[in-house]
Amino acid sequence: MIAVLSFSGKPAESQHVLASQQTHYQSMVNEQKPTPIKVTDNVRKTLLENGLTVLTKEVHTAPVVTVQVWYRVGSRNEEPGVNGIAHQLEHMMFKGTKNRPIQFGRLFSALGSDSNAFTSYDQTAYYGTAERNKLKSLLVLEADRMQNAVIDTEQLASEKRVVISELQGYENSPEYRLNRAVMGAAFPNHAYGLPVGGTKADVEKFTVEQVQQYYREFYTPDNAILVIVGDFQTESTLETVKEIFGKLPKSQESRVGETRLIASVQQSTVNSPIVLREPGAGKLLQVVYPLPDVNHPDVPALEVMDYILTEGRNSRLYQALVESGLANDITAYVSSLRESGWYELSVTAAPRQNLAKIDSVLNKTIANLVKTGVTAEEVNRAKNQVEASAILSNRDLTNLAIQLGNDETTTGDYRYTERYLAGVREVKPADVIAVVNKYLKPELRIVGWFEPSQKQTKALTTKIQYAQTTEKFSPGSPVAPQEVIKYLPPVDEVTYLSTRELPQQFTLANGLRLLLLPDKSTPTVTLSGYINAGMEFDPEDKAGLASLVADNLMNGTKTQNFLAIAKALEERGVGLDFEAYREGVRIEGESLAGDLPVLVKTLADVVRNSTFPATELELDRQQALTNLKLDLDDPDEVAIRTFAQSIYPKNHPLHTYPTEKSLQRIKRQDVIAFKTKYYRPDTTVLALVGDFDPTKVRSLIEAEFGGWKVSGEPPKLKYPPVPMPEKIVRVNSVLPGKVQAITYMGYTGINRQDPRFYAASVLNQILGGDTLSSRLGAEVRDRQGLTYGIYSYFKVGKNAGTFWIEMQTSPEDTSKAIASTHEQLKQIHQYGVSASELEAAKQNLISNYNVSLANPEELAKRILMNQVYGLNEVELRSFSNKIHQVTLSEVNQAARELLHPDKIVVVTAGPAVLADHTIQ
């Protein structure tokens, strides 16, 4: 996995602007500043004799622990010709060791650990979060692969195919291709200008000797940081760490002590825009300004500058570009790394807009900021957002450990984020103007334009019915759990009882349901909500209506315009977002504990009193049309749309998707009528988890939502039954300019209330629940190297959902991967699973469930959806026991009843795939 880690209040991915609110809400907030929270309180740093740095922090809010190993090596340590070798090695670290010649993903899965890894510019990191009794086992596995990884010819050849599949997946994205060109021009003499994952040309040439040498040079205790956060005792854990890791010697070939010759970041000589004219759907603009390294004193002011320019609807560039209708969206982030940094702005143009004009407005807006200055109000709002973001991001143990590891790896100081936040608090308006003048000079920037080279055309879709096979594919043997157990480190006995506290439940007189679960572990509140107003209610000729309603809720109410709504939330760093799903509209909210009234009052106002101003509604429609255009150029979006429409007939709720015509047909009166009909208190559920007094929150909800009145019965919708196809159906949607194919295989499934749900969950875990340890993962990804990722799902809801398998493959591997997957389905349908597979899958599901509930966001969603699905209130506690009680006969019966290998729909989107008859 590739990740871009940087010191920024915002991640380096696209930012959805969280709409927000103003003045008369100020009275709800205590203006007295709280004492700054130090996430590094109680962190202990230990240096072992072999040079290993150990960071430990006890957090006893849940019986869960996260173990992470960070290596101070990333793409920064590469050069042309070996670009991507750090990422390739990351993949190889899962292929087994001298002591454990087995895919490590299977070992982590057997522990029920949420484990993964990523490579970035300055580091490579491996992490696992599991129940606390698995702590020692995780330590043993990480120590083993620190020095005993097996890197051989056969394994490398297989994993190089996987990496190339991953890279080709990125190549499908015009944004990725444009960013690669812009970064290469911005850093022509530095490794930061190389793509983190490498290139296909370089990866294909990697030799076993090169990868082994890289491993010996950089994977050594004195180049590593071990981070442990969670429910453990520090003293005894450090003794265990010394026992396991302390005996590892430094590598004799280590390059850790070498003085690295750092290439200076020279001013680019590229003065005109880099223009890519390639197949695609939308025009894109990217701008990169070089910045100083992470330890430079200007970094806090640069972060505040970024928030003023791009964060929220009141920000300067959002107003100038998005609200004006020039752009569909704008995202930005400050990246601060060991040797330099950069500020990246990315803009998606609105239809029929000119990139030169957008670029001109962007430049003028930045120049005008210098000319007019920034206000103290803007600076304070940005500082509050940065601080709230830092606190909210650390609600989860894994994220907290990642912050510590990233800080220590990149800056040499695990306390860096606190120094950075202290710097942010000191930023003045003059500091913001100073960094704009210093770094955002027009002559310093690198600009890239993506201009689609052709008019968008519909995907060329071919449909083939298969009646016989002309190629037989022999799958490997199923994963043997006894082999996993053979190499699994001993697990400490469980010494705690899983008696999870249940939420308090209340129902208002108007039918609104409220679930409250206090949690004082962090001074934050997480809100998850649901309104039964999803896309299933879209008229076929006005598909997209439910989403347009949800997207416009915060565009104005009877008393507040959209800027006022945005301002109230942004000033406190409060997040509130609505998204229409097939079943229901989901509400996601988060705030610091003291700002909960702002969140609740804003939510009530927009849900009850939204007015859908015509100007903002039309702007959102244009954005929806642009997003549709981009979706129809995305193989994953095209594949899932074609897949659903190949299974479900017209007039079925799961068949309907927005089109340009359906979006154009929607009138303002349609939006108002839909909102009036489907947004009702008696179909609304709110779940809150966090630092609050339940009595006070209940009173607040009563006050804000109690007056919400509607008449009549709530609308109900029951999906009609859909027959299975009579034979295998194969569809290939060809998209110009794509190099990686996306495939979906499946058919109709079950609903959440189906008595087979728990057996189906266990069956799915064995079949494709994990891309490294499942049958599909072990065969298609690990043994054959045909895909970067393959998963299966039973997507359930109040109504029957869909069973599907998804994978991404190179076009030359697609047919073989489909054939292999089909054979695995036939095998498990006909012969079932083994008792040892059953027990391993149940343990994995139970452990993953317990780990997920340590994350407040996951906990709030689980509480919410249990209520939405009409499950018993004790489901939060009893889920694990129900999984534990699933029998072998129940799983094998589910395999016979729910897997239909000879009645499957197979859809592939992306490059043309040879339609050879590989499945029957």
Model regions and ranges:
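Bacterial N-terminal signal peptides
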Residues: 1-6
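Short, conserved secondary-structure transition motifs
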Residues: 164-170, 265-277, 382-393, 591-592, ...
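Histidine-acidic residue clusters that define the catalytic metal-binding segment
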Residues: 28-44, 141, 166, 185-224, ...
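Proteolytic maturation boundary segments
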Residues: 7-55, 233-277, 319, 418-531, ...
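Extracellular/periplasmic catalytic domains that process cell-envelope and extracellular macromolecules
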Residues: 39, 47-49, 60-63, 119, ...
